[in-house]
Amino acid sequence: MSEHLSKAQVKWVRSLQQKKNRDAEGVFVAEGAKCINELRGAFELLLLASPDNASAIEIEQMSSLRTPQGQIAVFRKPTTDNRYPISQLMLALDGVQDPGNLGTIIRTCDWFGIHDILCSRDTADCYNPKVVQATMGALARVRVHYVDLPKALAELKDKHVAIYGTLLEGRNMYEEGAIPNKSEGVIIMGNEGNGISEEVRGLVSHPLLIPSYPAGEATSESLNVGIATAIVLAEFRR
């Protein structure tokens, strides 16, 4: 039986639900045995709360979930120098705001072997507890870089990296030749309501369209960004 958590430790974990406190401490919180076990091999574990050292009430107090998962862990955030190999397929997120969408996208990238995601500064925090929960441990294998996105994309474009963007005026991505090289480049996915920003849109070298079906008939105005990401990545990996 491990030593029972102190009131100060319980209060500390609760405080980490706020981004400013996570940033100040350089830590993040994960919940649930499966997610925690996935992350333990990739991040330094600082604290683990479980029925062995915390009461059900204390776990509920520390949890950010409606239904606590029984275990809560605090991990140290990785130090990142925002360097990444350019000879690979990467994803870029331009202002994706919803934590659930971001978590799903990170998990989808893990499934399709995307190891690096470039995020604009206004994209949701990948260490938000809701994001961490939605990734189901994928953060152990997918690196998330918060960058000046227009600048980063411009530098990649100068190095002759293909910049793909999902746009309504884009080319049907299933057409032959729409994607010259499926193994390299950057795919940009935009904000839930506004899509890709004007500044970033100007850097797209290969605009792509996910066609609706049947062609020419009225459909929903747009796809959820998480679903759209999965559709695009599936085509790139096909």
Predicted regions and their residues:
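Boundary-proximal intrinsically disordered activation/regulatory segments immediately upstream
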Residues: 1-50, 123-124
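Active-site/ligand-binding-proximal alpha/beta "capping" segment
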Residues: 165-220
